[in-house]
């Protein structure tokens, strides 16, 4: 099996990683191959079906692979950890896809590395399939994301608090795995030469036009801020909660990365938290835009000496960029909300129109996804929103204001941007429970729906329905991969 590796990170950034090998596993078995993604990468899916168990378990890596564990630091729940790094993952190499984009291939759950900090470096079946599924859901929604190329069962039990669980390894594809925390690792050691080298590499890889900018490092900071503001706005528009927005989980590329305790909100409440470790609600749904700015401030601190030799001027330049983050986010969010509402053009009252609907939704704990989807029917039917929203008098007033702002073919345009299918928590859990019992049918069915979430299909009605009453109130997610 031929992989056309061109491993620029290993070649150009020696000292930013540790060469390492995957731990041996007893009986690797390919559970699922993302054939569509394999095609995008220029790989032979049929051959991968035959050889993938050995390749994607790390047992027999292709020629040209260069397995390594990347170094990074990070703020975790606000506290700084100067050394984190890939504790259970190995970057095995980089390939160029059919569109000419450089993509990382990484094994997650491949065993201990020098960054494991006492952990076993393994992953279990449930979290691996969960990341596979949610990544594909985000891709289907058009949100920048890492994706899973393959899931492999290792054939070995992995000891966790709940007992022995089946081991698994995920092959993750990403634009890169450069994180805010990668810069922090070297900045914390006052190694500004390596911070500069990393910035040069990141610019060349992700934002090559900026190399000619008058102040390329400041332009890079602004580009990352813009990409992340766009990303978080997209999360908010679909009700996605990342769950662990630590700086080591923020990618410079602007992709969603590290699907640990993530989940989709159903009943609208800005305070929604599902993560079992987010006891204070730091990463609640409604806090995500604020954490976006907080994390970008930490990136600015790491890059500060690159902005100007004078510390005062450097801080002024960083703060000038940081001061725009809220406006960047709000502009992207409002643009997306106009699309969700089917509005024609842009008018000054659009923000209040959106906020009034959200207030009604919050009061009723209305299902985020179904409410916006049903707006398509509400274009002509007053009763369309009543199953999800209370207060018909208030609703009628809002409907009148909203309808005056609608453009042509509003119902079609609303359906085109508001999904009917999301990775609802109870359906994800059902699919994972079935997989643990040896049945991947529900997983495949859910993936099939989520790959085209805007098209309603007969036979999938159950996947569009909210969880049973009370399910999400007690639902908790965990960091598994």
From Swiss-Prot:
Enumerate the InterPro entries for this protein.
Answer: SelO (IPR003846)
Any idea which residues are catalytic in this one? 248
Cite the binding residues for ATP: 85, 87-88, 108, 120-121, 172, 179, 258
Please report a single Pfam family linked to this protein.
Answer: SelO
EC class of the enzyme, as a word: transferase
- Needed co-factor(s): Mg(2+); Mn(2+)
Q: Which UniProt keywords apply?
A: ATP-binding, Magnesium, Manganese, Metal-binding, Nucleotide-binding, Nucleotidyltransferase, Transferase
Catalytic activities: L-seryl-[protein] + ATP = 3-O-(5'-adenylyl)-L-seryl-[protein] + diphosphate; L-threonyl-[protein] + ATP = 3-O-(5'-adenylyl)-L-threonyl-[protein] + diphosphate; L-tyrosyl-[protein] + ATP = O-(5'-adenylyl)-L-tyrosyl-[protein] + diphosphate; L-histidyl-[protein] + UTP = N(tele)-(5'-uridylyl)-L-histidyl-[protein] + diphosphate
Against PANTHER family, the record matches this protein to: PROTEIN ADENYLYLTRANSFERASE SELO, MITOCHONDRIAL
Question: What is the name listed in the Swiss-Prot or TrEMBL entry for this protein?
Answer: Protein nucleotidyltransferase YdiU
Q: Which organism is it from?
A: Cereibacter sphaeroides (strain ATCC 17025 / ATH 2.4.3) (Rhodobacter sphaeroides)
Print the organism lineage. Bacteria, Pseudomonadati, Pseudomonadota, Alphaproteobacteria, Rhodobacterales
Q: Which gene encodes it?
A: ydiU
């Amino acid at each position: 099996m031929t992989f056309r590796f061109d491993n620029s990170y290993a070649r150009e950034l020696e000292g930013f990683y540790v060469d390492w090998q995957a731990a041996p596993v007893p009986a690797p078995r390919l559970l699922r191959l993302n054939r569509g993604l394999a095609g995008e990468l220029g790989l032979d899916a049929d051959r991968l079906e035959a050889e993938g168990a050995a390749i994607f378990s790390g047992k027999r890596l292709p020629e040209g692979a260069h397995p390594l564990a990347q170094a990074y630091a990070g703020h975790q729940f606000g506290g700084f950890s100067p050394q984190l790094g890939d504790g259970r993952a190995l970057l095995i190499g980089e390939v160029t896809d059919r569109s000419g984009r450089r993509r990382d291939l990484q094994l997650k759950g491949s065993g201990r590395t020098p960054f494991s900090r006492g952990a076993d470096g393994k992953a279990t079946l449930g979290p691996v399939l969960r990341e596979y599924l949610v990544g594909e859901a985000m891709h289907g929604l058009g949100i920048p994301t890492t994706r899973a190329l393959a899931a492999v069962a290792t054939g070995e039990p992995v000891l966790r608090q709940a007992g022995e669980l089946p081991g698994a390894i995920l092959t993750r594809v990403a634009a890169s795995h450069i994180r805010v925390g990668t810069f922090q690792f070297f900045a914390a050691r006052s190694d500004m030469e390596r911070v500069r080298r990393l910035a040069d590499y990141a610019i060349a890889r992700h934002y090559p036009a900026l190399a000619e900018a008058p102040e390329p490092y400041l332009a890079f900071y602004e580009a990352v801020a813009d990409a992340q503001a766009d990303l978080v706005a997209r999360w908010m528009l679909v009700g996605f909660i990342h769950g662990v927005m630590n700086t080591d989980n923020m990618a410079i590329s602007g992709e969603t990365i590290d699907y640990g305790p993530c989940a989709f909100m159903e009943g609208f409440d800005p305070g929604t938290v599902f993560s079992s470790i987010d006891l204070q609600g730091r990463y609640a749904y409604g806090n995500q835009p604020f954490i976006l700015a907080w994390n970008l401030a930490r990136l600015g601190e790491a890059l500060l000496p690159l902005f100007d030799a004078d510390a005062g001027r450097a801080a002024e330049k960083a703060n000038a960029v940081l001061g725009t983050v809220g406006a960047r986010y709000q502009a992207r969010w409002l643009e997306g909300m106009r699309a969700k509402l089917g509005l024609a053009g842009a008018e000054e009252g659009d923000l209040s129109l959106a906020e009034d609907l959200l207030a009604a939704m919050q009061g009723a704990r209305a299902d985020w996804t179904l409410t916006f989807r049903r707006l398509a029917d509400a274009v002509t039917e007053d009763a369309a929103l009543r199953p999800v929203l209370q207060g018909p008098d208030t609703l009628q007033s809002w409907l009148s204001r909203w309808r005056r702002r609608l453009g042509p073919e509003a119902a079609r345009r609303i359906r085109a941007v508001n999904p009917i299918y999301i990775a609802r928590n109870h359906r994800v859990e059902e699919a994972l429970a079935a997989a643990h019992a040896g049945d991947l049918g529900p997983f495949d069915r859910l993936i099939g729906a989520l790959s085209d979430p805007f098209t309603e299909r007969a036979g999938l009605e159950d996947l569009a329905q909210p969880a049973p009453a009370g399910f999400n109130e007690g639902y908790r997610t965990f960091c598994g991969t």
